Amino acid sequence: MNNMSKKQEIIGLIDADLLDNGTRHPNLVLLKLAGFFQDNGIPFELILDPQANTLHYTRIYLSCVFTFTKLPELYIRSKGTPEEKKFKCGGTGFYANEVSVMEYRRKREQDMNQLEHDEFLNTLRNFHGGKEYGISMSRQMPYYHLYDQFINQQVKKGFKREKFKDYQKYSIGFLTRGCVRHCPFCVNKLENCILPYSKLQWFLDDEKDKNGKLVRPYIYLWDDNFLASDPSIWRPLLKQLIETKRPFQFRQGLDERMLAESPYGEEMAEMLSRSRYHGDFIFAFDNWKDHDIIEKSLKIWKRYNPKKGTKFYLFCGFKQSPTCLLYTSPSP
């Protein structure tokens, strides 16, 4: 727990998804905000009571990832009162269902940049480079202990600590951001390119326990479409991941189609086969019309990875009518 001797100066952090339905993973934006406040010696806490009194918080940063999440009572209660001004809200949960392309573009751009333009944050020192004041979201080291109190509460309720390993055992970040697929159901639907984002060392945690073992021995990567980036991007980054000798996983899945579409597809499969991959390899299969290229890619993949577990995120029904026969090859 952070230094909270001056309660009137505490900054509150809210993971709206956690307070509503619960969530398997920590909120990376909040981890980075917590790291920024930790760097500056500013007291903060993760608010775990959806009906908490907000009076002793000077500012509250609320993040919501999913559109189905119900915002917490403490925020709803603040509407139309002076307390509402304390809240800074963001996340895809506030705009992902926006149907107007222009409005979606405006909201996403505003959301992606708002913390780096935050007046209060820009009064605080930046200790990770890029600029002298204000948070750099790509460079900021996450504070990986933000959810410790939540985990301890759940353990007291009878849950096993291992249930919350995604909060405890992983360094988390994006090596790249962006995509080129323009899938209409994805938050990256308006993106046109994939660019480097964070360097691995900016979020790779080296904390060790009393026995000298890494507290967070695994790496979670949340890149949108890593393999579709330019070879000058993905190749050195994948090499760097392999050289850490730490198990890693691309949590949002990898684009299987690139193995067949890219002239470097076999190199991708070979490099991944040499990695200490964490768990099964997960690929995206979002559109049934891609089944031919997926099958071609799988043949390449299995040539280099004949025994490794391979799974797909399968998006059922996209651009399919109710009468369409899925999983059936089209007539010649």
Could you tell me what each predicted segment is?
Residues 1-89, 93-98, 109-111:
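A short, structured N-terminal alpha-helical element that caps or precedes a catalytic domain
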Residues 4-8, 51-58, 81-83, 166, ...:
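Flexible, charged surface loops at secondary-structure boundaries
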Residues 13, 204-311, 316-318:
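Conserved SAM/AdoMet-binding glycine-rich loop
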Residues 23-31, 165-209:
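Canonical Radical SAM [4Fe-4S] cluster-binding loop centered on the CxxxCxxC motif
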Residues 60, 72, 96-102, 184, ...:
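Short, charged, surface-exposed secondary-structure boundary motifs
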Residues 82-179, 184-187:
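Catalytic core of nucleotide-activated saccharide and alditol-phosphate transferases
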Residues 322-326:
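Catalytic cores of alpha/beta
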Residues 327-332:
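Conserved small/polar residues in nucleotide/adenosyl-binding loops
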